[in-house]
Every structure is written in structure tokens, then in C-alpha cells.
Amino acid sequence: KISSTQTEIDEKLKNIYSNLDPWQTTMVARHEDRPKAKFFIDNLFDDFVPLSGDRYYGEDKSVLTGFAKFNGKSVLVIGQEKGEDLDSRIERNFGMMRPEGYRKTIRLMNLANKFNIPIISFIDTPGAYPGVGAEERGQAEAIAKSIECCMELKVPTIAIIIGEGGSG
């Protein structure tokens, strides 16, 4: 009985989610109960060692970065993090990265590339932070250099969209 009920639920969910219009799809991606990057980091990886700072200006808490073990193998983990409640969302800038976040990920991607460590990224952002301060600190250049770095990597990379996938 439980098995048939689960099958029925699965079929109904598949039917619902395969017929969403674009706005409904956006609302699902933005749903506050979706698991965030921290959830995946805590539940998929062992021995996560967080690394922070861009070595120029400061730390961007909208992106979690660090080395961890996945099935016993070393990986670099990058996760855009929106936060779970109002305070953590403000602290994490609602998942909108600043130049410091892009420079931090570039620094760590280059390190992973140097030591032949694969990269796993979790994407969940409405887009890059559009503030004046971010622009003054080189937001556009940081985004461009991040894209360039990704294109030049020699290590395997996996990018998993877990929510929004806005530009930046």
C-alpha cells in the first residue's frame, strides 16, 4: 500500500513539475525551504575545511569555499549561500556575491588546479551584487576573471544548480 501511494505521489509531482510556466519555475527555484549550499556541504562531504578571504579586501560570506573529502577523495567545494533566516540572509547578502567572493573563488580554483583537485560548485544566486561599492571594487572585472579562470581549469568541475541561477 505504501509503495503504491509513493508511486502515485511521484507521478503527480512529475506531472505538476513538468507543466510549470516560467514564473512558476522561478518561484520553485526561489522557495525558501529549498536546501541551501550549507545543507549539501554538511551532508555530502567529510572533513570540510572552510577557507575565506580574497587576500585583497576581505571576506564575502555569500559564497562558502573550502576543501573536503567526497567518497574519500579531496575536492574543492564552492557554494553560493543565501542563508536560512533573516539575519543569516543579511550576513550572506542574500546570495549575491561581491568582488571579494569572485576573487576568493578564483584563488581557490587556481589552488585546486595546481594540485589537481576536482571542483564541485553549488549555484544558488539571484545574481551578482549591484551595489556602488561592489562596482567601485571591480565587480565586472572580478566576474570576467572568474569566468576566464573556469575556462582555463584543467581539473574536472561539476556545477549543480540548487536554486536560482541568476547572472553573475
Task: Indicate residue ranges for each PLM-predicted region.
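Terminal-region recognition feature
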Residues: K1-G168
